Regions:
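Primarily short, surface-exposed interaction patches in extracytoplasmic proteins
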Residues: 1-219, 246-251, 264, 270-327, ...
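A structural supersecondary motif
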Residues: 237-247
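Globin-like tetrapyrrole-binding proteins
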Residues: 330
């Protein structure tokens, strides 16, 4: 009996330790290197066929791709050779394509309007010399994206106004703004709308790496959200997020009643308005005007104009609803404004 009792006790301890084990890491299909020597590849069905070596189109360059294996690594060196071949200084495409994509990201449209087609069927760049300059900067700076980002956002073109009499005259002459004579007003992307709404409430989880989750169940940034092609994310889908089934070099920008319903009546946006109101109320010593100024700073990055502050103060003081309902309504209005949704 003593031995049996000891056995049961050990089993219970073992079960307790098993319960403390972390869950197994998720698995995914992957590939591994075959070693420094790659298997020979030849055309099937041909006897005594010579092995085919990696290379470009033989009609353009009959020489095989130079491959220098690294004896210190268990790899053939073929992928490294391909990467060097693609990013070679003699290949003008990668630097131009990348510079054009960055320009499109900051200005709403690329210098070349067909970002995935730089061939004869694509649209020629509106400013070829500028595109060449940006591509050269990218190469000369060792492919530093940070340097190119800095050049674009500190340029005179990026710092132009998007409103005013001069802008109106420019819009009449150049409606599509191909000559970059003004800054184009653009709406935030689906991911930016979601992250901005979570960020101003103080809920955004800015941790790097790690597991993500569904949009409505996690406060992590949108870059970490789970993407399922057969199960669209309602929060992002309403603002034209790509479906993940096909490449989309230029996103569609639509204005639909569904977006208004989501922003005004959607439960997710109402939760963000309540969270923003709680954040404003967390500073119990702040005055009403200070809370209004904080709300404007969080939502718009500026302080309210005197007329705006007076209107909000009048609304909050005249409200006869109990609790913080009026403050929640005010926060809801901030989240539904064009100034919150658009970059101008």
């Amino acid at each position: 009996d003593a031995a049996k009792e000891k056995w049961e006790k050990l089993r219970a301890e073992l079960a307790a330790l098993e319960a403390e084990k972390p869950p197994p890491l998720p698995c995914a299909p992957s590939v591994t290197d075959v070693g420094p020597l790659a298997p020979e590849v030849s055309i099937p069905g041909r006897r005594n066929a010579e092995p085919i070596e990696p290379g470009g189109l033989s009609v353009l360059d009959p020489n095989p791709l130079p491959i220098v294996p690294n004896p210190s690594q268990q790899t053939t060196g073929r992928r490294t050779a391909l990467a060097h071949w693609i990013t070679s200084d003699t290949n003008p495409l990668p630097s131009r394509v990348l510079a054009n994509r960055l320009w499109q990201h900051h200005f709403g449209r690329g210098l070349a309007e067909s970002p995935s087609d730089f061939g004869r069927l694509g649209e020629p760049p509106s400013h070829p010399e500028l595109l060449d300059y940006l591509a050269s900067e990218l190469l000369d700076r060792g492919w530093s994206l940070k340097h190119l980002h800095r050049q674009m956002v500190t340029s005179a073109a990026y710092r132009q106004a998007s409103h005013g009499p001069e802008v109106t005259a420019s819009a009449q002459k150049d409606p599509l703004n191909k000559f970059v004579a003004r800054m184009t007003v653009r709406r935030l992307s689906a991911e930016q709308v979601r992250d901005a709404a979570v960020a101003i409430t103080g809920e955004l989880d800015t941790r790097m790496a790690g597991p993500g989750g569904d949009s409505g169940k996690t406060a992590r940034r949108a870059v970490y959200l789970k993407v399922q092609r057969n199960s669209r994310d309602a929060t992002l889908d309403v603002f034209d997020v790509p479906d993940g089934l096909a490449s989309m070099p230029v996103r569609n920008i639509t204005t639909t009643p569904t977006q208004s319903l989501f922003m005004i009546n959607g439960p997710w946006m109402m939760l963000r308005a309540k969270a923003l109101a709680r954040r404003l109320e967390s500073n119990s010593s702040a005055t009403l005007d200070e809370r209004v100024a904080t709300a404007y700073r969080l939502a718009y990055g500026r302080v309210p104009r005197p007329d705006e502050a007076a209107a909000v103060r009048q609304f909050l003081q005249a409200s006869d609803t109990g609790g913080n309902a009026a403050l929640v309504d005010f926060c809801h209005v901030l989240l539904n404004s064009s100034e919150f949704l658009y970059v101008d």
